[in-house]
UniProtKB/Swiss-Prot annotation:
This is Magnesium-protoporphyrin O-methyltransferase. GO terms for molecular function: magnesium protoporphyrin IX methyltransferase activity; methyltransferase activity. The gene is chlM. Its EC number is 2.1.1.11. It comes from Synechocystis sp. (strain ATCC 27184 / PCC 6803 / Kazusa). Keywords: Chlorophyll biosynthesis, Methyltransferase, Photosynthesis, S-adenosyl-L-methionine, Transferase. Pathway: Porphyrin-containing compound metabolism; chlorophyll biosynthesis (light-independent). GO terms for biological process: light-independent chlorophyll biosynthetic process; methylation; photosynthesis. InterPro entries: Mg_prot_MeTrfase (IPR010251), Mg_prot_MeTrfase_C (IPR010940), SAM-dependent_MTases_sf (IPR029063). It is an enzyme of class 2 (transferase). Belongs to the class I-like SAM-binding methyltransferase superfamily. Magnesium protoporphyrin O-methyltransferase family. It holds the Pfam family Mg-por_mtran_C.
Amino acid sequence: MTNAALDDKTIVRDYFNSTGFDRWRRIYGDGQVNFVQKDIRVGHQQTVDSVVAWLVADGNLPGLLVCDAGCGVGSLSIPLAQAGALVYGSDISEKMVGEAQQKAQEVLAYGNQPTFMTQDLAQLGGKYDTVICLDVLIHYPTEEASAMISHLASLADRRLILSFAPKTLGLTVLKKIGGLFPGPSKTTRAYQHKEADIRKILGDNGFSIARTGMTSTRFYYSRILEAVRS
């Protein structure tokens, strides 16, 4: 692991255990947020809804073993558990995991509760039918993201679903323009990834693309790839 990658992980963990936790808890919740944050909330929810719809449409979600890698506050884990999946959610932030546990207890009561744990993605073990990693790769450069994807692929018996910020000319220009305006929310680095690079990493790990999706709002862009073992 490079020092740069280690720095990124440290930045992400510390941010989401401090000021970032309150900010993103509001964004992923239903409280008052500003215009940009509300747009990000809508975009993230659209990505979650797309993935849940895929799994529900397959017709075998009840009892399916799913790993939600980088679960945040449980935005994906909870609806999957509601639909009957056996969900193991992990996040690098202890505070995020605590919030996810609290939300699951409130929403699911005594129903099918997800299992949440505080873990770096590189420490994840076990085997799952489906491994899902949404809105995480944006925090890491392609070199580190490649290692993460390869590790997640090793945990997936059948399917791996990823989302990432696509690296296109238009979005790169928007990102550079945004970087000209300083703000308190720019605490973590934001990395875009070429879709061809992500597809190659998946292919090198024995996966082929089954379904794709794209979420685009004013301030949120997320490419979704569902890959299955070839």
